[in-house]
Amino acid sequence: GKIPIGAIKKAGKAIGKGLRAVNIASTAHDVYTFFKPKKRH
């Protein structure tokens, strides 16, 4: 059967939102670890 274009667009938008959320989360984590006082050995 043919997949409707609307379904593909909806899936693409959902994936895009998920990737953006992951990017924001990893960036926030990087910033947090950068500013967190490091334990000196």
UniProtKB/Swiss-Prot annotation:
- Choose any GO biological process term that the UniProt entry carries and state it: innate immune response
Q: Which UniProt keywords apply?
A: Amidation, Antibiotic, Antimicrobial, Immunity, Innate immunity, Secreted
Give the main location: secreted
Give a Gene Ontology cellular component term annotated to this protein.
extracellular region
| Histidine amide found at | 41
In the induction comment, the record states: By bacterial infection.
Give the source's domain of life in one word.
Answer: Eukaryota
Tissue expression from the record: Hemolymph.
One protein family per Pfam: Moricin
- Where is the protein found, in the record's own terms? Secreted
Q: What task does this protein carry out?
A: Has antibacterial activity against Gram-positive and Gram-negative bacteria.
Family under the similarity heading: Belongs to the moricin family.
Q: How does it assemble?
A: Monomer.
Q: What is this protein called?
A: Virescein
Species per Swiss-Prot/TrEMBL record: Heliothis virescens (Tobacco budworm moth)
